[in-house]
Amino acid sequence: TVCMLLCMLPTVAFASGSDYLKIAMLDSGRKYFSADWVKAFLYEAKADGYTHVMLAVGNDGMRFLLDDMSLTVGGKTYSSNAVASAIRSGNNAYTTASSGEWTESEMDEFFATAKKAGIEIIPLLNSPGHMDAVLYAASSLTGTNCSYNGSSRTIDVTNDTAVRFSQAFLQKYVDYFAGKGCRYFNFGADEYANDRYTSGSMGFGSLQNSGKYGYFIKYVNELAAMVKQAGMTPIAFNDGIEFANKMSASVGSTTYTFDRDIVVCYWSGGWSGYTPRTAANLASDGFRIINTTGDFYYVLGKNDSFDNGYTYAANWSNYKVCGTSLSASSVIGGMFCMWSDYPGAETQTQEAKKIRLPLRAMGLAMDGAYTSGMDTSVVPGGFNADGSINTDPPAQSHDYRQTASTAATCTEAGSVTYTCADCGDSYTETVPALGHNYAAADDAGDTIYTCTRCGE
């Protein structure tokens, strides 16, 4: 039946009992993808073995607008229409190569699709850098220049108005995604003002050299606290965390160190003049790591290792982070990133055609199941080989619910039966016999043992 087809996983899926997070990250901040495309991506990622999809709703561009966008900053309230309009203008100022924003109802549909597919969503809303559209809105609405030294994408973390506006903005999204049941929230925190400082130690070096790095640590910790208060785990990229081995910094008389509860997506060990702390050192400092090694990026509009096929995935190792092998206890997951640096370089259909098999190869590599002759069949509800959206009934997880049970006794096993509410498929689990629980009692000098459960 059609219902049974809906509950059958496609053949390319590979089940794993590991707790290792397998994340497919989509840069949907720089480039807008249609709602139907995102739903297909969710089905594709699930079929390819991923446990999570990370949606970059805010990364340079801001592609998701809530129904209520109103903000109150410094005692002044900005209407929902004013904020939404400013974000749209900011998106247009960032790029005219891609346009559009998802509505809240569309995002709700993404979560419904993810639930059907059996995959989780991790939001990414980058701050204090990579926030061109939000920075544009902050400056235009408040009448204050919120930029750090002329950066078009990074707020000044020493500017109170910039900080309060950005944090009020993020709080709305933290609340929304926590309400959808998300367990993680990535606020990025990478490449501070690297558009303004394009060589050497770049933006983080500028912060440190000017004595302002403490403001950055303070800001990052405040975002982490916001996320934790909402019941989620904070995530950030690695390069700004203890940059150049600077473990702490001060604002006035207060010294700040980074919150060790932040899970670090380690993507780069740096380059000439740009010296993030090593993955090994961050792990020894107590940070948990997600292997985000940049050599495995797919970057729209740039040459990368997946432009001509998927076999580069054979080089992946779950616990080898930017060339350094770490312990399984330090590395809690891996992430394959599809960045949209040049959003107009390809249409979404062209991109789907190019990423379909690398996405699958990397998912299988994270499961230790990659082979050069992997199954290349089309995923129902995912993408066709030409990049168009497949319209076959998509795979989804069974919605099993308890429908019958027999209690176990001391000597006889019990059982619990579960039935899928969608297709009727069922299975039964055995509950082992409990065994006698004898208690001793004195009876006129004799010791009598009686089972407290059945009386034997």
Label the model's feature ranges.
Residues D48-Y50, E106-P128, S152-N186:
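An active-site-proximal structural segment forming one wall of the substrate-binding cleft
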Residues T158-V263, W267-F287:
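Active-site neighborhood of glycoside hydrolase catalytic domains
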Residues W37-G61:
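Catalytic domains of carbohydrate-active enzymes, especially glycoside hydrolases
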Residues D19-Y20, D60-K116, M131-T161, A178, ...:
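Aromatic- and acidic-residue-enriched carbohydrate-binding clefts of CAZyme catalytic domains
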Residues D392-E456:
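Extracellular modular ligand-binding repeats in secreted and cell-surface proteins
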Residues M8-G17:
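Sec-dependent signal peptide cleavage junction
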Residues A249-P393:
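Flexible, acidic glycine-rich loops studded with aromatic residues
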Residues K31-A45, T275-T278:
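Short, acidic/polar
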